[in-house]
């Protein structure tokens, strides 16, 4: 506690313009693709506006508390987030499961992550399932977002093409957040084409909605198990690796326990989980945020505080995004996930030893099949592991 208070007292002196802008940039990125994905998942799950606002409230506030307190405690730029791969999984899962079943999956997944942190078996658990198989499942889960980006071309070609051009031009010039430029150009084109609805906004605090869980074997296997694996492998593992590569000691077990506890508390209010950031972690941890490594924690504090403030206005956020054309939201989600789709596909297929197992997992996950009411990600994971074990035995 003394270290936390000391770092809090040092915050005004340690904060620099570069750390401030890095923290705000992380928030801006999270306001683009990830929020668009939540809104898509909410549509699939037939959430009303209050339920969607509650989901955003739980995600934003939980992520903010995670990053704020851990950054202050360890003087490390730890960035909180919700798992975008997990939200992508929910978009397929909510079509086959009730809201109450999804909440039960959130609770079980959070409890499992807490258990992993308490026991310290994080790395051992990651070694049980081959990483290429998990990456193939992730690529399969995200695949439809990339496809949907181009499905929107006939519907609204001007917006989609403008956003694509903005994204790749920004990438070409090395901008840190190309998806933000896509959003700005997409908004400009939508305004020019008069496709933005007139907002009827009321600035009010979010009103969290409580949902009682309903446990089922199907939701445990199709949602809870993949959610846990995706969160550990695509959020905590790369997020902690970013901190290690930046020269910081990584409080992995503490982060797992704290993130799992926040996820557990937010689950009944439709929060899909809180964890360390992966994609945006490098923005706060690198020298671009602040040359002095001992001051970079302020980027995590700024990000956490801003997350909390935005989360409290969850209903307003839903109203703002509700004014935008569906093509813009779909393009935003797809563009935001392009790097993740590319890297997960590459990681799954680059090692010849695991390539066949990864292909089985990828194709099965993309297929969308759900025999026995169990979703395609579960069957893809199961088939991929089985294929790997059979191939390993044959080689032996």
Where are these regions (language model features)?
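Tryptophan-centered motif/residue detector
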Residues: 55-57, 82, 153, 167, ...
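Helix-loop-helix hairpins and the membrane-proximal interhelical loops
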Residues: 1-53, 179-253
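Short polybasic/polar patches that bind polyanions
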Residues: 43, 127, 244, 267, ...
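Membrane-interface helix-boundary motifs at transmembrane edges
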Residues: 171-176, 247-248, 290-292
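Buried hydrophobic packing segments
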Residues: 89-90, 166, 185, 242, ...
